Structures are given as structure tokens and as C-alpha cells.
């Protein structure tokens, strides 16, 4: 409040003396001063950033996101990128005459869909992100769960659901669950100044590829790396109590809230794996997880380095000690 008051007095008293550009420079300086304690707190810490396909709606937005991530590296933070690619996979499937199907926010993945997913995630999106990191002045390196057997998993069992009162099994195909994250290769990459870019393709004991939701992978990797934060970027402003009302934004969610909100139908569709990924991370030592709108310019910097924040924060509620 005192900063705001001083700024108002300054503007009123000196607005005729100084140019608008000079005032703007002073405001920028205030932004840097506000960011300083956060930069000090986060220095040398690991942050896992999941960049969703829905956040990559344009080349300019993607460039802004990567610039922000490269900036984090330059101020001493160690970012790890996990990328999705759902819209791109769906688009590619459509061009190949195949319909995308989902169950509880997870893509049903038969053999053909698995091949398409690998083609899009590893051969297209991953290489584009690594290239863009280089253009923005950083050093990126592309990885999958195969590399160093980093992400080991198993195929999910068929799901039992009630359809018209009849219990039915739904086989979601090569959709996997993480068993083990081997972070050794990530530590090596980070210590050498690189930004790892991870496609969410895991491997099972027989060498089969598994499609694992990128939000879940990001949560598991954040936990394995003992990351300071997990950031999940999407195309909405965090969690909304009413999907049709942008003013129903929920700014904070505890682990205890998540199951209740899923049961109430507040958390549904693609937001379910996001909150589950956040919950896994926070349960396993990550201080906080943040769901933010990646299509808002520099939203990640606003969430990390300002007092206000703009997304939904997931944290572990600790009861006060008596």
C-alpha cells in the first residue's frame, strides 16, 4: 500500500515535470524491485513447467513462454519443460481420418494412435521447442522417457464404468501410469546449463511406448527432482468454479479440496489430470503448484515474481500446531 501511495503522490506532484517515458521507467524499476526477493528465494532451485498444447495457440505466445523460461535460466533458476500436444495430436489424427476419443480426460490410445502421438510429440513439438530455446538464447535438449529409462511405467488396466446401469469395461489402450522416475539424466543436463524438454512418452518393462498425460508426468518429475515449484500452463485462467463464468476463478486450492471439487463436478475433463498432477507433486514435497493461463503474455513471470499472482495455486494445508 505504501508503494502505491508514494507512486500516486509522485505522479500528482511531478507529472508536469517529467515525461511519460521517465514515469514508465520508474514503474519498470518498481517491478524489478518487487521481483528481487522472489529471485533470491528461487535462485538455484528447480522448477518443472508443463507447457500444454492448449497454451501453444500461436507462434507468438509460444515464443513469449520460451523467452520467459530462458529468462528463468539466466537468473539462476533451473527450469525443466514437460510439453503436451493434445490439440496437435487430435488435428493429426483428423487429417489421417481417425477420430480422437477420451475417457475421464485421458486419450484412448490404440496402436495407431500411439504412433501418431510419438510422431507429433517427439518428432514435431519437442524439436520445435528445443529450436526456439536456442533462438531465444538458451540451450535446450530434447528427451523422452526412453532416454536413460527416465520414465518407467505400466499400461493402465481397463476401467470399469456403469453405462445404463450395466458395469462395462473400457480399455483405454496404451495409456500408462508412472512407476518410477529416474532423474539422474535430468540432473546431469541441468548442471551443465541446459534446459531439458521432455515428451511424455514412457517405456514399460518390455520396451513398449506408453502415452502418459503430460500433467501427470510433470507432477511425477517435479516430485522426483524435489522441485521448488510445478507450473502447469493451459489456456484458461486457472480453476473456475463455473466453466462458463470467468469471474468464478478459484485462486487457492488445498490438497484436501481437490477430491471434493472433483466429486462436485467443479473439476472435470482435462482439468482432472492437471489437479491430480499438482496433487502428486505437492504431496511429495514440492512446495506449491500453479495452474496459469499461458496465453496471457508473461503470465508465468507475473505468477512467480509479483505479490499478486494470476493463476490457481495448489498447496498443502497444514493445521496450526497447538
From Swiss-Prot:
InterPro entries: AceGlu_kinase-like_sf (IPR036393), AcgluKinase_fam (IPR004662), ArgB (IPR037528), Asp/Glu/Uridylate_kinase (IPR001048), NAGK-C (IPR041727). Its EC number is 2.7.2.8. Pfam families: AA_kinase. Signal peptide: none annotated. Pathway: Amino-acid biosynthesis; L-arginine biosynthesis; N(2)-acetyl-L-ornithine from L-glutamate: step 2/4. The record marks 50, 274 as: Transition state stabilizer. It is found in: Cytoplasm. It catalyses: N-acetyl-L-glutamate + ATP = N-acetyl-L-glutamyl 5-phosphate + ADP. GO terms for molecular function: acetylglutamate kinase activity; ATP binding. CDD domains: AAK_NAGK-C. HAMAP family: ArgB (MF_00082). This is Acetylglutamate kinase.
